[in-house]
């Protein structure tokens, strides 16, 4: 079964950086412990305040349930995070393991 990688890339407002970093720590903890997701957050090298969230699902079926399995706390954290994103918005990408 091929794995699936789902990414969300965005830049945050510079004045929101400290709040964002505190929130993303809480979000990662919640999604990996409570939600049992394979989830990481990366900052682009050389591009301060540009981040990519990465979810790795072990199958297409698991990927299809990612959003359905977000509890109320995860939805609240995501909503707060969106307020830190700059006017460029979020860019989504889904890739499926080839081999």
Q: PLM ranges: what are they?
A:
Residues 2, 52, 75, 93-94:
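Residue-level marker of intrinsically disordered, low-complexity segments enriched
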Residues 4-10, 40-67:
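Short, well-ordered beta-strand segments in beta-rich or mixed alpha/beta enzyme
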Residues 30-39, 56-91:
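An amphipathic, aromatic/His-enriched active-site/gating alpha helix that lines ligand/cofactor pockets
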Residues 1-2, 99:
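Absolute protein N-terminus
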Residues 11-22:
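Short, surface-exposed ligand-recognition loops at beta-strand->loop->(often short) alpha-helix junctions
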Residues 91-99:
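Short, low-order "capping/linker" segments at domain edges
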Residues 13-15, 58-60, 98-99:
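Generic structural motif
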């Amino acid at each position: 079964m091929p794995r699936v990688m789902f990414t969300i890339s965005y830049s945050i407002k510079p004045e929101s950086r400290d709040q964002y970093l505190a929130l993303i720590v809480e979000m990662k903890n919640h999604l990996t412990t409570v939600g049992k997701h394979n989830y990481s957050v990366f900052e682009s090298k050389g591009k301060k305040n540009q981040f990519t969230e990465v979810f790795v699902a072990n199958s297409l079926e698991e990927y299809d349930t990612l959003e359905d399995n977000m509890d109320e706390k995860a939805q609240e954290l995501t909503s707060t995070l969106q307020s830190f994103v700059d006017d460029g918005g979020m860019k989504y990408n889904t890739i499926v393991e080839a081999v």
